[in-house]
């Protein structure tokens, strides 16, 4: 018996729940990129955008690899200039959301 599909909001809530176990992670009350964002050291590393896609900050080469593999797209905030270190991940690739959010957490936490 198959389960009904999970909504992007429900999937992101699971990511949030898993990552909030890290004492350095908080969920912003502000709206970052269209929805409540996960932050570390006051910096956004993951959020759910207004299209229901996971938005994560990763190294440029990792974003390039996700784009090349068809698993992600560069995030364009609407100015026609995609951001080098931000990728969006479709809801159909939901099994990647938590691992990529963890990668984003580690990447942003390592930056000073």
What are these regions (language model features)?
Residues 1-112:
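Charge-dense, helix-prone N-terminal extensions
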């Amino acid at each position: 018996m198959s389960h009904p599909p999970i909504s992007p909001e429900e999937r992101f809530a699971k990511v949030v729940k898993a990552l909030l176990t890290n004492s350095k992670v908080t969920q912003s009350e502000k709206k970052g990129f269209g929805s409540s964002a996960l932050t570390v050291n006051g910096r956004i590393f993951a959020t759910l955008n207004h299209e229901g896609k996971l938005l994560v900050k990763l190294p440029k080469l990792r974003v390039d690899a996700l784009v090349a593999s068809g698993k992600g797209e560069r995030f364009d905030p609407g100015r026609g200039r995609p951001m080098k270190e931000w990728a969006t991940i479709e809801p159909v690739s939901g099994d990647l959301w938590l691992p990529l959010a963890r990668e984003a957490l580690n990447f942003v936490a390592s930056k000073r």
